[in-house]
């Protein structure tokens, strides 16, 4: 049936096209030059089978009208020739949001926000001898915790070749003295070279309107490194190192308020001070420096005594007013008149003393 249908279409084309009929009557009976276009025409004829028909030909006309019109861009148009208003209207038509401006700001992390893996000072440190049982026990615990610190020191040396835990104590002591000297002098610019950004507000807090006398007298024991840790911030390449140094020294401290009254300490009394000071360095930074970062205050340390200058305001309780009767009011008026007359009498005594000199010598 399909072959018969195709043959019928060929005959119809031959009847419609007179040029084809004349070519067919030529000697030889061939189609000649018109054979190839005719074959292409026959091949382009749509043949519809049962499988090619739509399964539901109900809305055939509406499906014919259904199409998507593509708005193709003009490739010959240059980006520089389009105005901002025209670009804005085109983006608004297509529902495209404008590009967001770059609002993020670069930030620099120069120090950490606290102490990571803080050192826990042994109770009674500085008071127990190494020869005693408790002192030997403290020394043994220190050796057990030393393995992590050695790994941290090795990590610090990979960034700073000149670092030595034996020589760092003297360097840390110089930083400690310089920081406290500038704090007592209230030099808020030079102190920033020796303290971190976290430590600066804690040291300079409540220093205003006060006179501070501080002096580092001597070291009772040489300062030594007791703890070292290295951590990363945000990325693995951003490394920070913290070293805890033990100071046992003699210091003098006296604090006066704005009126010159002694608030704390004394300028003639020296005290033994045991401190665990944390120093930090941004070891990833080539120009990083060791700076005072924080102090470790153990839980077993007794609380500080308050300033000796304290005031207590004692207010007298107000008595409620009493109601006076008519008789009491008259008595009170008579008493007041008598008191006024008594006050006026002594006024004449100075005059008499001038007129009549006393005989007593």
UniProtKB/Swiss-Prot annotation:
It is found in: Mitochondrion. One of its GO terms (cellular component) is mitochondrial large ribosomal subunit. One of its GO terms (molecular function) is structural constituent of ribosome. It comes from the Eukaryota. Residues 319-361 are annotated as: Disordered. Its main location: mitochondrion. Keywords: Mitochondrion, Ribonucleoprotein, Ribosomal protein, Transit peptide. It comes from Drosophila melanogaster (Fruit fly). Transmembrane segments: none annotated. The keyword Transit peptide applies. This is Large ribosomal subunit protein mL45. GO terms for biological process: mitochondrial translation. Belongs to the mitochondrion-specific ribosomal protein mL45 family.
């Amino acid at each position: 049936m399909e072959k018969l249908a195709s043959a019928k279409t060929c005959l119809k084309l031959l009847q419609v096209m007179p040029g084809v009929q004349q070519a067919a009557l030529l000697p030889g009976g061939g189609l000649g030059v018109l054979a190839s276009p005719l074959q292409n025409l026959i091949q382009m004829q749509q043949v519809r089978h049962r499988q090619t028909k739509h399964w539901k030909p109900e809305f055939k006309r509406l499906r014919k009208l259904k199409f998507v019109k593509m708005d193709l861009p003009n490739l010959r148009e240059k980006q520089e020739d389009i105005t901002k208003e025209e670009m804005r209207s085109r983006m608004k038509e297509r529902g495209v949001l404008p590009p967001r401006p770059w609002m993020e700001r670069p930030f620099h992390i120069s120090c950490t926000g606290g102490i990571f893996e803080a050192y826990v000072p042994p109770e009674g440190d500085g008071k127990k001898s190494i020869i005693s049982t408790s002192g030997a026990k403290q020394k043994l615990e220190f050796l057990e915790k030393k393995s992590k610190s050695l790994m941290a020191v090795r990590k610090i040396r990979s960034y700073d070749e000149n670092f030595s835990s034996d020589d760092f104590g003297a360097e840390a002591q110089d930083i400690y003295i310089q920081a406290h000297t500038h704090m007592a002098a209230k030099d808020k610019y030079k102190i920033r070279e020796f303290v971190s950004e976290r430590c600066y507000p804690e040291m300079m807090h409540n220093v205003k309107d006060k006179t501070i006398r501080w002096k580092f007298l001597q070291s009772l024991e040489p300062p030594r490194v007791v703890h070292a840790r290295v951590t990363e911030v945000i990325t693995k390449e951003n490394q920070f190192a913290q070293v805890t140094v033990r100071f046992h020294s003699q210091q003098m401290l006296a604090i006066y308020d704005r009126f010159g009254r002694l608030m704390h300490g004394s300028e003639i009394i020296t005290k033994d001070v045991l401190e665990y000071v944390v120093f930090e360095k941004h070891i990833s930074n080539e120009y990083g420096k060791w700076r005072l970062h924080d102090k470790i205050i153990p839980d077993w340390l007794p609380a500080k005594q308050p300033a000796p200058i304290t005031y207590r305001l004692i207010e007298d309780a107000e008595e409620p007013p009493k109601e006076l009767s008519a008789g009491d009011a008259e008595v009170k008026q008579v008493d007041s008149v008598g008191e006024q007359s008594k006050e006026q009498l002594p006024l004449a005594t100075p005059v008499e003393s001038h007129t009549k000199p006393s005989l007593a010598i």
